Curated annotation (Swiss-Prot):
Keyword Metal-binding: no
Location of Phosphothreonine modifications: T114
Organism: Olea europaea (Common olive)
Post-translational modification: Phosphorylated by MAP kinases.
GO CC, alphabetical: cell cortex; cytoskeleton
Protein name: Profilin-2
Entry keyword annotation includes Ligase: no
Keywords, ordered alphabetically: Actin-binding, Allergen, Cytoplasm, Cytoskeleton, Disulfide bond, Phosphoprotein
Length: 134
C-alpha cells in the first residue's frame, strides 16, 4: 500500500458511525520533515515548524509556552502523551500528531469532528505503523 493510500483510506475517510464527517487535512511526514503523503488540503509548513514539533517530542513541554505552529496556524498545545502524541486546539478545531519510529501521522479537524474522533483516527494509524516497525 502506498503512503498516499494510507492518508486517503485511513485518515481522510468517514469517521466510524458518522457518515460525511472526516478530517479537514492529514499527512504522513518523516522525522526529517519530508512529506511522505498528504491530503490536498494539508497546509504548506516551514522547516522550523517541523523542528519545533520534533523538539517537543524529544523535550515534552517545549511548545507549551509558544504554541504549536503548522502552516502559519497557531494551535494551543493541550494534554498529549509525552514523546508519543501532541494535541493542539484552535477555536472549534485542532490537530493531533502521533509519532512513530520513522514518521509523524498528522490530522487536522474542524467541527463537527470532535477532538476524540481525530485522536482515534490519527492514533489508530500511528499505532498500526508502530506495530509494523515504521
Amino acid at each position: 500500500m502506498s503512503w498516499q493510500a494510507y492518508v486517503d483510506d485511513h485518515l481522510m475517510c468517514d469517521i466510524e458511525g458518522h457518515e460525511g464527517h472526516r478530517l479537514t487535512a492529514a499527512a504522513i511526514i518523516g522525522h526529517d520533515g519530508s512529506v511522505w503523503a498528504q491530503s490536498a488540503t494539508f497546509p504548506q509548513f516551514k522547516p522550523e515548524e517541523m523542528n519545533g514539533i520534533m523538539t517537543d517530542f524529544n523535550e515534552p513541554g517545549h511548545l507549551a509556552p509558544t504554541g504549536l505552529h503548522l502552516g502559519g496556524t497557531k494551535y494551543m498545545v493541550i494534554q498529549g502523551e509525552a514523546g508519543a502524541v501532541i494535541r493542539g486546539k484552535k477555536g472549534s478545531g485542532g490537530i493531533t500528531i502521533k509519532k512513530t519510529g520513522q514518521a509523524l501521522v498528522c490530522g487536522i479537524y474542524e467541527e463537527p469532528v470532535t477532538p476524540g474522533q481525530c485522536n482515534m483516527v490519527v492514533e489508530r494509524l500511528g499505532d498500526y505503523l508502530l506495530e509494523q516497525g515504521l
